[in-house]
């Protein structure tokens, strides 16, 4: 979902969204005058037509009323209390998950028991269109909205697959780059 004050939308690659040319999704649209409703297999998006940015007053995303679909309702700004959390950037100074007497502040991750994920890509840098791509600022920095909403129920593999369609495949180093790993928890004897 995108909002731009000048009506020009960003289709270039960002640090998160490498691929903006994803496969088409089956959907139906209903224009009800002041509102528009877009229904897919996974969600129903209800948008109240307005001149301002997307917000809790003009956007509601719900689950379709279908057997086997985990029910949810989401509005912008709503906190996901069932998020499974993500990763932490550094463990320097931590003892387990504690830094002194403070627990580690872990940001929301991609997966949630709520069955949905909201990703705000509005502040990420874009890649320019040069042969040797470099980062560039957005035209409407701080004013435009570039959001992704994924509804997947408890099919976490589908969530990961869908995310890699947008973000690109994750590069993994080859196994040989890790060298020889061997570990056991008891002490070695002289004979070993």
Where are these regions (language model features)?
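Conserved, well-structured core segments
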Residues: 180
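Short, acidic/polar
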Residues: 188-192
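Catalytic and substrate-binding clefts that recognize carbohydrates or anionic sugar/phosphate headgroups
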Residues: 29-175, 183-185
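A low-complexity, Ser/Thr/Gly/Pro-enriched, surface-exposed linker/loop concept
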Residues: 1-33
């Amino acid at each position: 979902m995108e909002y731009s004050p000048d009506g020009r939308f960003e289709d270039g690659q960002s640090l998160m969204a490498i691929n903006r040319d994803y496969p088409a999704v089956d959907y139906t649209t209903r224009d009800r005058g002041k509102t528009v409703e877009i229904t897919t297999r996974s969600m129903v998006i209800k948008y109240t037509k307005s001149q301002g940015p997307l917000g809790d007053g003009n956007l509601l995303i719900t689950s379709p009323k279908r057997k086997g679909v985990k029910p949810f309702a989401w509005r912008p700004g709503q906190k996901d209390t069932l998020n499974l959390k993500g990763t932490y950037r550094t463990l320097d100074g931590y003892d387990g998950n504690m830094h002194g007497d403070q627990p580690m502040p872990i940001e929301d991750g991609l997966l949630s028991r709520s069955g949905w994920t909201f990703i705000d890509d509005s502040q990420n840098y874009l890649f320019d269109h040069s042969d040797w791509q470099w980062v560039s600022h957005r035209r409407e920095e701080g004013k435009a909205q570039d959001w992704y909403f994924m509804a997947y129920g408890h099919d976490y593999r589908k969530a990961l697959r869908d995310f890699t369609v947008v973000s690109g495949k994750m590069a993994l180093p080859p196994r040989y780059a890790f060298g020889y790993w061997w570990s056991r928890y008891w002490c070695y004897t002289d004979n070993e």
